[in-house]
From Swiss-Prot:
Biological processes per GO annotation: translation
Recorded family membership: Belongs to the bacterial ribosomal protein bL36 family.
Gene designation per UniProt: rpmJ
Organism field: Acidiphilium cryptum (strain JF-5)
Protein name per the record: Large ribosomal subunit protein bL36
Coiled-coil stretches noted in the UniProt entry, renumbered to this chain: none
Keyword Lipid metabolism: no
Any GO CC annotation of this UniProt entry: ribonucleoprotein complex
Superkingdom of source: Bacteria
Upper taxonomic lineage: Bacteria, Pseudomonadati, Pseudomonadota, Alphaproteobacteria, Acetobacterales
InterPro entries noted in UniProt: Ribosomal_bL36 (IPR000473), Ribosomal_bL36_sp (IPR035977), Ribosomal_L36_bact (IPR047621)
A family per Pfam: Ribosomal_L36
GO molecular function, one term: structural constituent of ribosome
Keywords, sorted A to Z: Ribonucleoprotein, Ribosomal protein
The keyword Ribosomal protein is annotated on this UniProt entry: yes
Amino acid sequence: MKVRNSLRSAKARDKNCRVVRRHGRVYVINKKNPRMKARQG
C-alpha cells in the first residue's frame, strides 16, 4: 500500500478504484486489482 499526500493520482490509475473512509483515514481500494491500494496522510 502506498501512502500519499493526495489520492487524486492514485484514484485516476484505474477505473475500478474507489475512495473510501475507514477510521478517519482516506483509502483508495480496487477490488479488481488489489495492488492498486493507497492511503492518505
